[in-house]
Structures are given as C-alpha cells and as structure tokens.
Amino acid sequence: MTQCTQSNFEFQAHFSRDVVARFDGGTISSEGGSLLLRQTDQRLNLLTRFGGCFLDGREQDRIEHSILEMVSQRVYGLALGYEDLNDHEQLRKDPLFGVLAGREELDKPLAGKSTLNRLELGNGQRDRYKKITFWKPGVDELLVNVFLEAHPQPPEQIILDIDTTDLPLHGKQEGRFFHGYYDSYCYLPLYIFCGEHVLCARLRSSNSDAAAGSLAEIARIVGQIRTAWPAVKIILRGDSGFCRNELMNWCEGQGVDYVLGLARNQRLRKIIGRQMWEATEQWNRTGQPSRVFAEFRYQTRKAKNRGWERERRVAAKAEHIDGKENPRFVVTSLSKEQWPAQELYEALYCARGDMENRIKEQFSLFADRVSAETMRANQLRLYFSVMAYVLVSGLRRLGLKATELAQAQVSTIRTKLLNDHRLKVGGFGGD
C-alpha cells in the first residue's frame, strides 16, 4: 500500500511572507511547533487582548518595541520552556520568535532582557524608566471571557473549583512571610478553575487565612458568568480551607450551590460513631479498606462570632484503612435527593482532585518564578504563566482532539510537539 507523508505545512501568513514548516528545512529555527501556538492565539485572540490590558506611558513615536511584541515574547517563551529573561538575549534574534511576536521587520531583534524587565517593574507611578503598567481588572475579566467564549451554547451547570498552593520564596520579596503548614517563606496564590479553564490567579501573602479574598473573587466571577449565562446552575467546590460561614452565606443568598470540605473534630467523630464501628468491623473481617457513609444536620458552635448561624447538611465518610480510622466530612447546600451522601462524596467532591493537576501545570509554566522585588511585578509574572497555560490548553482543546495528546499535560505537549527539533522552519529572508 502506498503511504503518503505530508512534507510541508502552511500556516497563517506573516504580513507579505508565507510561513511554511518542513521537516528538512535546515537549522534556521528549531521551534517549529510554536507555530501551532500562533494558530491557537489567532483563534482565541488572546495576546492582543492581553496586551490591551497594559497602559503605555512612553512617547509613541519613539517606541522600538510595542507592548504586544513584548507580551508575546514573554508568553510564548514560557510556553516553550524559556523561563528566564536572560533566555531572550538569544531568542530575540530568532526570526521565528519575531513571527510569534508579530514583528514585521524580522531582520531586527526583539526586546532584550532589560527592556522586558522594565515591562514587569512598572507600578503606574511617574518614573523616567518604567512607563508601562498593567490593569489587573482587565486581565481578570479576560480570563473569564476566554472561558465563556469556549462554549458555543451556555451549559446547564458548571462547577467552580477553588484552591490555593504555595510559591516558595528565597529572597526578601514584598509580602514575604513564613507559613507554618508549608514550613517555608512563600506566597499563597488563590486559583479558581472551571474544568481546564483558569478563571482566577491571585497572588497573596501567606500571612492570612487560606480563604482570604475568595468571596470577592467568587462574586466577581459569578457576576460575569451570569451576565452571559443567566440561567446556568453554579456549584462551588473546595477543601476545608474554604469552609467559611461568610462564603456559604453568600452562596445561599445568591443561589450558588456548594460542596466544601469540613475539618474533622471530636463532635463530628462522635456523631458518626456507629458508622465508624461498622467500618472497623468490616475491615477486621476482610482486611480490606471499608467505607460507610452517613449524613446529618450540623451547626458549629459559635466562637468569637465565627460560628454558623444555621444548621447545614453534612455528608460523612467513615473509613477504616490500613488499620486506621480515616473519617472525612463535607458540607453542602445540595439536597440528598440530588446527591446522596456516597455519590456526593465520591463522584462530586473527590473529583476536585483534578484541579491539582491544573495547578501542577502552572508550575510547568514557571508560575513559581516570583523573584521580583514587588508583589505587583510578581503578580504580572503569574499572569504571564497563566496566559501561557491558556495558550497551550487552548491548543490541547482546539487542535489536539482525538490525538494521543488530547489529555496530555502541558509539559508533555511542550516536549513532544512544541519543542520537537525535527521540525525546522525557514524561509524568513524574502517577501
């Protein structure tokens, strides 16, 4: 049987130039897979809108490097595995990066590390050298808009996952505090996802409650979603770090359902004493992990005005595993008719574990590179990593369906596709 292998691939033209990728094109530029990201960006219109979230105080007739070019440099660089500004001292000379950044004159280099550094350090104040700043509300709104645009029709129901993680610090950055749980100096960013879509990435100091600021972010996101999809049903899902009376009260008042982890205590353990005994007996008979589920109404005791004002439904898992008790609890606004206790815990609550994979992908895109002096600059670095994630996940969603990379992590996509040095790109010399 005759087998035909396509020898070249045509991409969106770059001004008057054709862009063609071949597997025998020499060594002019070896990041040929990055053109797939360029195609994805043109579908999403991501980087143009992201660049529009910056305020440029420079004299426009004396500008050598536009904001869009510099923003594109940083985002594409992170997506392709170039985490350091020093990397751009070489990348700026690569004609393919010129194509990615949208530069028309490919014989001229892109911005160097010092110029890119000034892009990060702008604080909105009058400064001779740092005249660019970014508008956080605009970036936040863009993330939600990308999520909304990914759906041709409004879904009936969505689940918002909320979580936090630690970004270790090794210098004297602004907002640096020691966190006992993580046993290190760190930032404590707040992430909110819906499936693979990142809706919020808020940098925070680690000297506050894990849920600090979460209500404001949820209210903002829910408001924007309901403006576009007024009939959508929304469920908020998070661990016990977000089980706060203020947040649950707001959800109940706004018609947002929730399922949140509930930290165990002696009162809760006593309530499920019979189920815990049954689970232990099953383990004694079989030697296998055993689970017994229960549900009940529960209200915390008020302490320093932090208790619950009302009873709420709690689902419990009485588990005995490896010779030890392992009780777990979740509090929810969902009824038992909608979600019986076992299904609520196993099928709905435990599915939040997938968000941990999405957070790991942020680290694959260098979200932990927060070594700038100010929190504002480090928030921008976090945004750069998030935009790189949106770009690669967009490629995964739009371009890799029904392929072996359809469910791959972004690091795998980078290694197997974006950084495949067998794909060379040439032909940058003429019109």
Task: Report each predicted region and the residues it spans.
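Structural motif
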Residues: 60-69, 321, 372-382, 408
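Short, surface-exposed basic-aromatic patches at helix termini and helix-loop junctions that form
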Residues: 248-257
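Short amphipathic alpha-helical "interface-anchor" segments enriched in bulky aromatics
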Residues: 40, 88, 344-375, 380, ...
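Dynamic "connector" segments at or just before major functional cores
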Residues: 1-209, 213-228, 396, 421-431
